[in-house]
Amino acid sequence: AYSLQSQDYGKIKYIAELLTPGLVYVADTAPFAKALAALKLANTELVASANAARIDGVTPFSGLTETKPGRALDAAVAAIGPDTIAKFMFTSGSTGPPKCVINTHRMLTANQQQLAQVWPFLAEQPLVLVDWLPWNHTFGGNHNFNLVLRHAGTFYIDEGKPLPTLVGATVRNLTEVSPTIYFNVPAGYAALLSHLENDDALARSFFAKLRMIFYAGAALPQDLWMRLDAVAVRTTGTRIPMTSSWGTTETAPAATAAHFLIDRAGVIGVPLPGVDVKLVPAGAKIEIRVRGPNVSPGYWRQADLTALANDNENFYKPGDAVRFADPKDPAMGIIFDGRLVEDFKLMTGTWVPVGILRIGVLAACSPVLQDAIIAGENCEFVGMLAWLNMAGCRSLISEEVSDTPASLASHPTIREHISQAVGRWNAEQRGSSTRILRVLLLTDAPSIDANEITDKGYINQRLALERRKADVDRLFMTSPDNAVIVI
């Protein structure tokens, strides 16, 4: 995403300047030529399996594989210990610029042992994953990749993505290969669900060997949970366990997990073995902090961030909020309650719970919305900017229409569906902080370059609001234009 989808290469330049890598590898120089040209690589060895761009000074990868192992390699391997740096992993930038997290061997191996203890079924049958999640982020690159290594499983790389133009590849792959566990982010399930509901062959293949459905990376709207459950029962005659966990790049990544049956989205379980969790009052919410062998020692060449990462008892502070699933029984786990930095106050001083409100309204408007930005800081009411789910919109429209975001955003059936759905949602709310009074449908995709969306599909609420200030202003005009849906 940083090198092929980007237009300004801002993130990859930032990463290269921070890391000063001694070696950069690309499979082929041709697709990466512009990105490589944007970097200062005069003192960096460039290695490639193919050099279609004919860049001077490139080291062929085949030459490296001809090197004979010797004492130097043996010594390097022998020097590896628990606190040796295994990799640098950048955060996804969900709430700010990506941070360079130190990942040690202790972190990665401890986390896999923790998962093995709470998911003993992993040892009962060969593990098979079909996975698109990027390896430059901790969900795909640590959690899933290392899970396959730990359990000697099979990893099928899915070239698809949760986008209308790319989800077709995922559908083809899942029709051919039946996973035993399926990992995805909510955006991935949103893109895949309509295909599972309408393609019996896909559903049969998908559920044939499936032992568990897992989501993480963001909160899953309850309607997606219910639709997944329904298609599983329709296809197999039984419910497939659905679960989640919570963690960050700094926790390698899992810190909590729901290793028991749950019946709703949002529950992130209890601390993994060896993990201590501290719950701290934070205004009207409860902040979660964590320590354990899977927690990072800090950030690379970012001493200021490292100094702020932990509290005086060495608990890492991720800035997330939680609440008990059952206040009378902590063993029932905790529920993710949003990111503290995303919440804001209305003019009345009332806090708006952005994370909970966002997933609630997305569920209420199912199946037509893909994602949303909640707005209204220092305003009299809450508004919402939203992106359409193209497949979901088409399922509601009987006649032929132009298949573009702009045409669907102006279609009366879609607008009426949203107006009615949000109206029903509002009627169930007790206060102004969880009622949406205006909606504006966005017709341009969120920008990776502007850090508006991460490459795992999570919307950075704060940066998206800043980038779309003009759209936010339209929401709160005294007399809004016709594109704004007034509830």
Annotate the PLM regions.
Residues 4-39, 66-70, 111-130, 163-180:
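Conserved ATP-dependent adenylate/AMP-binding module captured primarily in the ANL superfamily
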Residues 286-346, 484:
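Conserved ATP-binding/catalytic segment of the ANL
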Residues 109-128, 135-201:
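Conserved AMP-binding/adenylation subdomain of ANL enzymes
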Residues 83-101, 112, 116, 246:
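ATP phosphate-binding P-loop of adenylate-forming
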Residues 46-49, 53-90, 97, 121-128:
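Conserved pre-ATP/AMP-binding loop-to-beta segment of ANL
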Residues 295, 329-360, 393-412, 432-433, ...:
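Adenylate-forming
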Residues 63, 151, 171, 180-184, ...:
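Gly/Ser/Thr-rich phosphate-binding loop
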Residues 344, 370-375, 380, 386, ...:
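Conserved C-terminal "lid"/linker of ANL adenylate-forming enzymes
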